[in-house]
Amino acid sequence: MFGSKFKICKIEAYEVIDSRGFPTVAAKVYAKNGVFAKAMVPSGASTGEREAVELRDGDKERFNGKGVLKAVNNVNTIIAPKVVGMDCRQQTKIDELMISLDGTPNKAKLGANAILAVSLAVAKLAAMIEEKPLYKYIRQNIMGDSSDSWTMPVPMLNVINGGAHADNTIDFQEFMFMPVGAKSLKEAVRMASECFHSLQSILKSKKLDTNKGDEGGFAPNLKNADEALKLMVEAVEKAGYKPGVDADVAFALDPATSELFDADKKTYTFEKALKAKILTAKDAVKKSEDMVKYWDGLCKKYPIISIEDGLAENDWDGFQLMVKDLGSRVQIVGDDLFCTNPKIVKEGISKGVANSVLIKVNQIGTLTETIETIKAAHAAGWTCVVSHRSGETEDTTIADIAVGLSTGQIKTGSMSRSERIAKYNRLIEIENELGSKAHYPGKSTFKSIK
């Protein structure tokens, strides 16, 4: 018989608001004496076809159809009666039960947002009762790993936004700083902050817009990626650092090209640049091999160390070409390509379509499946990047996941907007707790790069 203090006594879900002003699911999971843990679920703007289903109400009279009362009700009336009474340390058993209660391959019945809220809250409750921080509970109790050396993640900081995350003329979604030359997480955050403010002053001096996108980066109207990357080089240098893959600050891109892809024609169209007449109709349309050449050219001109979703999620042939041409010097990250799904990741490993996986807990919907995906990637020698979503909350669980599972990289927005900063502050707190046991890997986190 398990210890009664670990017995789940009550579960309640309710609507809260995310950083874009839309509802999302929160869940509280209670043990005895009123002890509880809470989790809030994020939401994406550009979503992959294979993502687990985020259940929305569709009632146009309420939150423009984006309410989540159906998902909340599924927690309170379907999940809670089955999970109440279970031991909160039985993470895998609870997650598998919720998956079976749903019964669909993509969690379409109950909603991944319903299932994930409970899954994360269960882990947080068990950690609390064990009197451990969540990252230690994940490693020691869920993974059964007693090692006591901890890898802090190198952050990817989104400083220029475009694509679906901003109302501007840039077709690519994210341009990011990576402080690879820092000696600690705290120093990485300081370097990133200084470069961020340096970029802001440069944009102002050039009379460019300093409004922010969903993830806290700037959203100026620029002609192309070259302009954005030149500004980033200037910002790093003005802040007193050296841009470079082997220097202080490297760059990462997330163009989110699935948003640009025409599956029938198998071409990519730079729609924003075309609409703004920055590119001609001929130059705005590219084939897979053209895109790979384009990325190759940018990587030769700028210190780009990582490209996420450089091709569309269904363009596996294109990804194989990209890995062949760029994979030894650039981290090729699959986001929409894999949707944090362990089965798809394993197929991708066998076909060599990337060398890194983006990890978004709400793409798959349980902590157990998230861990399975990370384990599969690490076993193949691939890297993992734990990621936020464009619609976030002040929940900091992903910071603990990144440390607990030694992913070595995290992508959680810019140096503005408190729902992003919350994750950095949690990482600083973890690094302070760990002291000399914390290791910041810098460039060595990129295992595939020679």
Curated annotation (Swiss-Prot):
Catalytic function, reaction form: (2R)-2-phosphoglycerate = phosphoenolpyruvate + H2O
Active site: 215 (proton donor), 360 (proton acceptor)
GO terms assigned for molecular function: magnesium ion binding; phosphopyruvate hydratase activity
Binding-site residues, (2R)-2-phosphoglycerate: 173, 360, 389-390, 411
Record's keyword annotation contains Magnesium: yes
Pathway(s): Carbohydrate degradation; glycolysis; pyruvate from D-glyceraldehyde 3-phosphate: step 4/5
GO biological processes: glycolytic process
Enzyme Commission code(s) on record: 4.2.1.11
Subcellular localization(s) per the UniProt record: Cytoplasm; Secreted; Cell surface
Cofactor: record remark: Binds a second Mg(2+) ion via substrate during catalysis.
Entry function: Catalyzes the reversible conversion of 2-phosphoglycerate (2-PG) into phosphoenolpyruvate (PEP). It is essential for the degradation of carbohydrates via glycolysis.
Record-given protein name: Enolase
Species, as recorded: Malacoplasma penetrans (strain HF-2) (Mycoplasma penetrans)
Gene for this chain: eno
